[in-house]
Amino acid sequence: DTDRSRGLGDVYKRQILKRFSATNNFDRDKRMEYLISYHNEICFYTYNDDVYFHEFTSDTIFRMNKRLEVKPVYVMGKGDKIPVPELRNEINQEAKFKKLIKFEYLMETDRHLLMMGNRWNKSAYIYDKQTGETIRLEDEQAVFTNDLNGFLPFWPIDRGRGEAKNEVWALIRPDQYMEGVEATGVNPLGFDLKFDDNPVIVIGTLK
């Protein structure tokens, strides 16, 4: 609602278009409700014209189209490694819960689905949609090699949109860049970076 005659607070009118049942895979423990926030933690991403989402303890990625129709498209089969909500409030327990699979951000290209953890389990998975193969990576190590000039490998943090949907990008801090220059003897920029310079953007194409 963008009627300019309305007050500023009414420029954008919020409205619930449709409600969906949660797909989280756990039972509430009423004894723990004073300690645990049971709100749904959801990862969203877009691919083509659809929205995809994955809930905290679910093992399924769902697709939502423009008609708000939801369909399961990927089942990850986490088995006994699905996180449980009680662990959400634990602090500094990454090693203890590392076996649990929790994705904090997802991205998809025409061929690949990238599933990445963060605080809980610092691992990542790459699913090849053509071959059906899934690769598991420890600690989100930099696994995309630079085949243009042989410089630093990188791990993407997001992808492009529209015609660039198969391009992924990452940021390299100035100190990381200079460490790479020292280690490889290659300096693609042709000059040294200082610690307070902006990070370098790396763009790669997944084929």
Q: What spans do the regions from the language model cover?
A:
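Conserved blade-ending motifs and adjacent loop-strand segments that build the rim/top face
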Residues: 73-97, 131-164, 178
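Beta-propeller blade signature
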Residues: 10-14, 124-133, 196-205
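Loop-centered beta-sheet repeat module
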Residues: 14-68
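Internal helical hairpin/lid segments
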Residues: 97-147
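Short beta-strand elements that form the blades of beta-propeller/WD-repeat-like
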Residues: 6, 42-62, 101-120, 150-179, ...
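Short loop/turn segments immediately following beta-strands, especially the blade-tip
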Residues: 64-73, 134, 206-207
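C-terminal functional modules
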Residues: 171-206
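Single conserved hydrophobic/aromatic residue that forms the stacking wall/gate
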Residues: 1-12
